[in-house]
UniProtKB/Swiss-Prot annotation:
InterPro entries registered for this protein in UniProt: ATP-grasp, ATP_grasp_subdomain_1, D-Ala_lig_Van_CS, D_ala_D_ala, Dala_Dala_lig_C, Dala_Dala_lig_N, PreATP-grasp_dom_sf
Protein name in UniProt: D-alanine--D-alanine ligase
Protein encoded by which gene: ddl
Gene source species: Clostridium botulinum (strain 657 / Type Ba4)
UniProt keyword annotation of Endoplasmic reticulum present: no
GO BP: any one term: regulation of cell shape
Pathway field: Cell wall biogenesis; peptidoglycan biosynthesis
Residue ranges of every copy of the ATP-grasp domain listed in the record: 99-293
Length: 300
């Protein structure tokens, strides 16, 4: 099969995407497929560069990759691709929309408000949410332009920074607890990872630098494990996920809260999904093969 590995793109996560793409290519080649590296530098590249491939493996992150646009183009061209469809991708990229659906479905998530300008900042509403808060681009990833703000004095500056990366900014209560991630493959949860950043939170450096954080497979207490698994599965169903996603949570006093869903989890050597799969004996090459297989089974 001729597999095009699509990477690069136009988002702030371009370098992360290129790293993911290189790793994916290295291991897909072990499966004896014909691999075509496809580096996207501008939106128009997609239509031209995917000609002649049988399957698109998406190693893109962020805008024009994770937000449903590339998925829609590939679907229009009748080219099968990895991961979730356009609707789920678009919703999960929009943190505000994701949290609205989670709240409607009675799935725990931290309180938040969104603003689209400095003038929109409602300090009373933020006080009700409770400090400290995370201020971040509504549709950003990899914790780019994400700041932990401890009081009202830092809000304006943090919002201004986030607005450089997105037209909407989320201000979300900081739920202090243990951060965990649940990797879902074809609707089943792989082993849970605990994320223990060496910085105050799991920022860009902690995510991608060697030694930036400790990410370890953990065995949760039985009752908590059941709650986490039920919540991850509820997210999968409510947001109509397909093939694979990563559900990030915080556990506070034995109660899990969903932070966000990642529909195209990173595939670098430091990435969480391969670590979780490896804990049940699924090698990186086998994981990629499963993603291709399950993606081809989805009716688009």
């Amino acid at each position: 099969m001729k597999i095009g590995v699509i990477m690069g793109g136009i988002s702030t996560e371009r370098e992360v995407s290129l790293n993911s793409g290189r790793e994916v290519i290295k291991y897909l080649e072990l499966l004896e497929h014909e691999i075509i590296p496809i580096i996207i530098d501008k939106k128009e590249d997609v239509v031209e560069k995917v000609k002649g491939i049988d399957f698109a493996f998406l190693a893109l992150h962020g805008e024009f990759g994770e937000d449903g646009t590339v998925q829609s183009v590939l679907q229009t061209l009748d080219i099968p691709y990895s991961g979730c469809g356009p609707l789920t991708s678009a919703i999960c990229m929009d943190k505000d929309m994701t949290k609205k659906i989670l709240k409607y479905a009675n799935i725990n998530t931290a309180d938040w408000v969104n603003v689209s300008s400095v003038e929109d900042i409602d300090y009373e509403a933020i006080e009700k949410i409770g400090y400290p808060v995370f201020v971040k681009p509504n549709s950003g990833g990899s914790s780019v332009a994400t700041n932990l703000v401890k009081d009202g004095d830092g809000i304006k500056e943090a919002v201004e920074l986030a607005l450089k990366y997105d037209k909407e900014v989320m201000i979300e209560n900081y739920t202090k607890g243990e951060e965990i991630t649940c990797c879902m493959l074809n609707g089943k949860m792989l082993p849970v990872l605990a994320i223990r950043p060496h910085a105050e939170f799991f920022d860009y450096t902690a995510k991608y630098a060697d030694g930036g954080s400790d990410e370890v497979v953990i065995e949760l207490e039985e009752n908590l494990h059941k709650k986490v698994e039920e919540m991850a599965l509820a997210c999968w169903k409510e947001l109509k996920c397909e093939v694979y996603v990563r559900v990030d949570m915080i556990v506070k006093a034995g109660v899990p809260y969903v932070l966000e869903l990642n529909t195209l989890p990173g595939m670098t050597k430091n990435s969480l999904f391969p670590k979780s799969a490896n804990a049940v004996g699924i090698s990186f090459a086998e994981l990629l093969n499963s993603i291709v297989k399950y993606s081809l089974e989805v009716e688009r």
